[in-house]
Amino acid sequence: MPTVDESVSQAIDVFHLPSGVDVSDYEIYEVATSDGVKRLRYPRLDGSKVTSLAKQLVDVRNRTLAAMSVNDILDIVADAAQLWADPDFELRRQAELLIPAITGYEPDMVRIELKRYMRQFRRRELLRFLDSEIGQPSMLDEFRPNKAGGYSKYVGPALTYQVFSSNVPGIPVWSMAMTLLVKGAILGKSS
């Protein structure tokens, strides 16, 4: 029988934290998949860790994301979606294995839906959405003439906190993409 340390080292990290965030306490969730039992690992964070993480996310956002153009962010989101549209992308293959086991959805449905859903995040679709919602996506970068005769610039929140649905995959992706497009950092957790 593996020791706790071996169990943790074999676990799949189902989280992402910025570099420099020190976490020493993890939870392990075991899920039975078509490829055997998989151990999913996520950090256990107390209030002070979450507060520190939120401050760090805002700091990194202010130094990086806030200075990027909306076109650069569009390209990054679209490139990520393109990776996820590829059935050979390792993280997608992992998702296709884990999502049915966690949600009870049929594997074929998950595979088809991942491909279909990722199409919404192509550059053309994202730009079309921004155009329909705010008119001038460049107003996220700089002051631009507005309809009233003055100048306006759209400013998104520095940080959003999102609780992700645990049983309906994909829903958080839209919120995360939109938050990134308005140059906001994201602190999220699964429900």
Model-derived regions: residue spans:
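N-terminal Rossmann-like NAD(P)+-binding subdomain of aldehyde/semialdehyde dehydrogenases
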Residues: 1-150
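Conserved small-residue-rich beta-alpha loop and adjacent elements
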Residues: 126-191
